[in-house]
Amino acid sequence: MGFDPENQSISSVGQVVGDSSSGGITAEKEPLLKENHSPENYSVLAAIPPFLFPALGALLFGYEIGATSCAIMSLKSPTLSGISWYDLSSVDVGIITSGSLYGALIGSIVAFSVADIIGRRKELILAAFLYLVGAIVTVVAPVFSILIIGRVTYGMGIGLTMHAAPMYIAETAPSQIRGRMISLKEFSTVLGMVGGYGIGSLWITVISGWRYMYATILPFPVIMGTGMCWLPASPRWLLLRALQGQGNGENLQQAAIRSLCRLRGSVIADSAAEQVNEILAELSLVGEDKEATFGELFRGKCLKALTIAGGLVLFQQITGQPSVLYYAPSILQTAGFSAAADATRISILLGLLKLVMTGVSVIVIDRVGRRPLLLCGVSGMVISLFLLGSYYMFYKNVPAVAVAALLLYVGCYQLSFGPIGWLMISEIFPLKLRGRGISLAVLVNFGANALVTFAFSPLKELLGAGILFCAFGVICVVSLFFIYYIVPETKGLTLEEIEAKCL
């Protein structure tokens, strides 16, 4: 018989006491939500795989961004495309470029329905399969329509990955390095982007080079899927299933203990059961023992979490990030880079800067905290956006202003919104609504990205680049107030403590 949430109580120190005769869950009496909990023990070697294989999915996302910019140039070449339908219209190019984005939106919608049923691990296995199928279809595509099917399929893998990867990492990483691990996922995305630009530049002068660009990554989804098959399910997801009666409680608890031992290494062999009992008690205390309804997303602590997560990923996009990167080559050209100075090389330069600044964020995030990095980074973005606006309105004969503003923007974004947006959405939602909540946040992210990308050109023609960048600067100022008054500090807290203290 499964664990019965009705047949439990909270003891005087806040512990779950189940009826063992019903095959339920019992927990030892331990202090709950301690003010100063001791750091979680873990083995460094054991902590690497639960990060590495989900992060491969993020790397594949970044690679797609970099490689596609090169693939478009290859596809449009009469001599190098190797196809008869190379004469692509601007609409065709837009469909190819945004095909993965539409797929990601579909993947986010699918994740909303199935994430809490199949779990984070199986979702990442499915994402790896979609990556592989999408890449293969793209590589062999004989006609335009098949190419788009491949792009959309690959994009569905992106949507599932960007939903499940931060969740799996957040739920399996020790609290003292959780921020660093999830920020490293963003580092993987940027690394993939730089790799995509680099590999794309190698194949761009080869006939049918665009096929080789996508073929290069075929081993990675296989590695990702194999690795996720080997890794255990998230112990918190297993305990959520137990608390909500979605299986035999005792068996699920034992599976969670085994999972935790594998994720943290032999150093916690003697304390794994105790840690699982503490997590169970904390989950029960904050109301995770009742199955969530859709309406709960928009009430109480869940609404607050949705406001924080949705606001961060919305500001992540509407503060101009897609537009600034889109406009980067022309900005650098005004500073003396020739038009033939290869957009690829320019993109690699920016990608390396993004990589360095994301690395800085990874190093300091669990020491400094989320809020200080957000406030400092976004303040730098405000300055850079107003500088860009001023350049286009008043200082067009001083290209150094544009270059400095561009580099400042990219660096500050990667120090703040870039990694911390994904980190916060992975840790702020209550466990029982984490799957659905993150899927909505991912949907907002990709939707806002699409909106800003598509609206940029007409708005630039209507308002002018100077006014548009200043408008982004004003939105950035609004985001500073949002961060200061709404976004909590989660540094060093367990996921259960975040739910109890920050929501």
UniProtKB/Swiss-Prot annotation:
UniProt xrefs under InterPro entries: MFS_dom, MFS_sugar_transport-like, MFS_Sugar_Transporter, MFS_trans_sf, Sugar/inositol_transpt, Sugar_transporter_CS
A GO MF label: fructose transmembrane transporter activity
Ranges where the record places region Disordered: 1-23
UniProt superkingdom: Eukaryota
Keywords: Membrane, Sugar transport, Transmembrane, Transmembrane helix, Transport
GO terms for cellular component: plant-type vacuole; plant-type vacuole membrane; vacuolar membrane
Coarse class of the protein's main subcellular location: membrane
Subcellular location(s) of the protein: Membrane
Spans through the membrane: 51-73, 95-115, 129-149, 152-172, 190-210, 213-233, 305-325, 346-366, 374-394, 405-425, 437-457, 467-487
Family matches, as CDD domains: MFS_GLUT10_12_Class3_like
Biased composition range(s): Low complexity: 8-23
Entry's Gene Ontology BP terms: D-glucose transmembrane transport; fructose transmembrane transport; positive regulation of flower development; response to nematode; seed germination
Topology term for the membrane: Multi-pass membrane protein
Entry similarity comment: Belongs to the major facilitator superfamily. Sugar transporter (TC 2.A.1.1) family.
Designated name of the protein: D-xylose-proton symporter-like 1
UniProt source species: Arabidopsis thaliana (Mouse-ear cress)
